[in-house]
A protein has these predicted regions:
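A short, GP-enriched loop/loop-strand-helix hinge that lies immediately N-terminal to
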Residues: 8-15, 54-96, 110-119
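Eukaryote-biased intrinsically disordered, low-complexity acidic regions enriched in Ser/Thr/Pro
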Residues: 40-52
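A short, Lys/Arg-enriched amphipathic alpha-helix followed by its capping loop at the start of a domain
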Residues: 25-35
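Hydrophobic alpha-helical packing residues
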Residues: 30-31, 76, 104
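Active-site charged/polar residues at nucleotide-handling catalytic sites that mediate phosphoryl
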Residues: 53-54, 138
């Protein structure tokens, strides 16, 4: 009997298209390896689909919000379904670049210089302070990335 794998991809984040591509590639590899694969999208019917399918394991092929941030991992834990990848805490911490870098630095790992700028500090009157902090701590050219997204969408 083949192991049943629920492959979750797509999702609602800005990284949906990347996730769908990942899902197609993972699905092909799993089928080629001999697994029975059901592909599911992250939507309002996900819990019902997982309860009906009762997979042996869930493969999370989501990128960004809800897939890499610990949310889906928490849901799967509640449902009692094993999954591939890190758990809730590790996923949540890793998705947050600022927290991850603080933890890395505490362990003595070298990290590039960075400045965390909130959306509120980009509004007047905080904008000048944010620019001053960037000018003081970083060199141009520089890279701007969202703190809690991956896949470098829009960069």
């Amino acid at each position: 009997m083949k192991n049943k794998v629920a492959l979750i991809c797509g999702g609602k984040s800005e990284e949906r298209e990347v996730s769908l591509l990942t899902g197609r590639q993972v699905r092909g590899a799993l089928i080629e390896t001999g697994f029975d694969v059901t592909t599911l999208d992250l939507n309002d019917n996900l819990v019902t689909a997982l309860k009906e399918d009762r997979p042996d394991v869930v493969f999370i092929a989501l990128h960004g919000k809800y897939g890499e941030d610990g949310c889906l991992q928490g849901l799967l834990d509640i449902l009692g379904l094993p999954y591939v990848g890190s758990g809730v805490l590790a996923s949540a911490l890793a998705m947050n670049k600022a927290i991850s870098k603080k933890l890395f630095r505490l362990e003595g790992l070298l990290c590039p210089k960075d400045v965390l700028v909130s959306r509120y500090s980009l509004q007047q009157p905080g904008l000048e302070g944010a620019i001053e902090q960037i000018d003081k701590n970083l060199a141009y050219p520089l890279v701007v990335k969202p703190n809690k997204q991956g896949s470098t969408i829009g960069l």
